[in-house]
């Protein structure tokens, strides 16, 4: 199958690559099917893209690229919804807000996207803690 994206050209994918989000994601609740693919010539960023709306693609990264000790505690309901049997099956990604000024690029560490890579289902959760910021600076040390 092919997806003609607004910013990343034509992307080929297979049905097995599609990740289903029952509730969508905040701001895009009507979109339930996404794929993930690498940003060209970049090992840190990925594109989290809707296959239902070719204009909706979000840059994401692993939180472990930013915070070595990043930890989240999923609630039982979230574990059940995601059908997680083993934490090794969980892929954790965080959204990136880009800016032409590199010092203003931020990562949302408070609302990770959790994906069960075996079952191909996902959910974006909100961490109820001040430990992580919604706008964590990616390249500049926090004051």
Swiss-Prot record:
SUPFAM superfamilies: BH3618-like. InterPro entries: Flagellar_assembly_factor_FliW, Flagellar_assmbl_FliW_dom_sf. Pfam families: FliW. The keyword Transport does not apply. One of its GO terms (cellular component) is cytoplasm. GO terms for biological process: bacterial-type flagellum assembly; regulation of translation. Disulfide bonds: none annotated. It is found in: Cytoplasm. Acts as an anti-CsrA protein, binds CsrA and prevents it from repressing translation of its target genes, one of which is flagellin. Binds to flagellin and participates in the assembly of the flagellum. Interacts with translational regulator CsrA and flagellin(s). This is Flagellar assembly factor FliW. It comes from Clostridium botulinum (strain Hall / ATCC 3502 / NCTC 13319 / Type A).
């Amino acid at each position: 199958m092919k997806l003609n994206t607004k910013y990343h050209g034509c992307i080929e994918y297979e049905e097995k690559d599609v990740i289903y989000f029952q509730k969508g994601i905040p701001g895009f609740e009507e979109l339930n099917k996404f794929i993930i693919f690498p940003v060209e010539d970049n090992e840190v960023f990925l594109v989290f893209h809707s296959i239902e709306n070719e204009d909706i693609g979000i840059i994401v990264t692993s939180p472990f690229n930013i915070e070595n000790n990043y930890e989240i505690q999923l609630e039982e309901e979230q574990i059940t919804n995601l059908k997680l049997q083993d934490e090794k099956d969980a892929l954790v990604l965080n959204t990136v807000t880009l800016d032409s000024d590199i010092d203003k690029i931020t990562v949302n560490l408070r609302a990770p996207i959790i994906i069960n890579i075996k079952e191909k289902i996902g959910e974006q959760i909100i961490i109820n803690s001040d430990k992580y910021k919604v706008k964590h600076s990616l390249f500049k040390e926090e004051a």
